[in-house]
């Protein structure tokens, strides 16, 4: 009588973790293979990295000297209240907007920099 796949699976299922570890090592030695996961190289490699980013985050790095003006611009951009906008400006670096287009991110950056802030687009 031949051993079936089901018999093997049932036998393996009843083993402890230590016994399974020993079994894997025995397979590696007997057949000269490794149970390590193989890293598959992406076929799109450099092309994927060259793909242009479509969503950007606008980060307020610092408010600079014109804090009041920066708070006003943050309020206008985000629609937040005075306290919330002040907390963002005081807590810099903080993300002002997430997932915006490149044009919108550059527009926000321009407004904030004109108010005296330092801004990063990520």
Curated annotation (Swiss-Prot):
A GO biological process held by the record: translation
UniProt cross-references to InterPro entries, sorted A to Z: Ribosomal_bL12, Ribosomal_bL12_C, Ribosomal_bL12_C/ClpS-like, Ribosomal_bL12_oligo, Ribosomal_bL12_oligo_N_sf
SUPFAM superfamilies: ClpS-like, Ribosomal protein L7/12, oligomerisation (N-terminal) domain
Keywords: Ribonucleoprotein, Ribosomal protein
Taxonomic superkingdom: Bacteria
MF-aspect GO terms: mRNA binding; structural constituent of ribosome
Main function: Forms part of the ribosomal stalk which helps the ribosome interact with GTP-bound translation factors. Is thus essential for accurate translation.
Quaternary structure and partners: Homodimer. Part of the ribosomal stalk of the 50S ribosomal subunit. Forms a multimeric L10(L12)X complex, where L10 forms an elongated spine to which 2 to 4 L12 dimers bind in a sequential fashion. Binds GTP-bound translation factors.
UniProt-recorded name of the protein: Large ribosomal subunit protein bL12
Originating species: Neisseria lactamica
Gene that this sequence comes from: rplL
């Amino acid at each position: 009588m031949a051993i079936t796949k089901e018999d093997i699976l049932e036998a393996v299922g009843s083993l402890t973790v230590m016994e399974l570890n020993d079994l894997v090592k025995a397979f590696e030695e007997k057949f000269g293979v490794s149970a390590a996961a193989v890293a598959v190289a992406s076929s799109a490699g450099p092309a994927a990295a060259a793909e242009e980013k479509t969503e950007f985050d606008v980060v307020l790095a610092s408010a600079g000297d014109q804090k009041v003006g920066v708070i006003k611009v943050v309020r206008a951009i985000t629609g937040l209240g005075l306290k919330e906008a002040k907390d963002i400006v005081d807590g810099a670096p903080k993300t002002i907007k997430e997932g915006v287009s490149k044009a919108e991110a550059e527009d926000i950056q321009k407004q904030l920099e004109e108010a005296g802030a330092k801004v990063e687009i990520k």
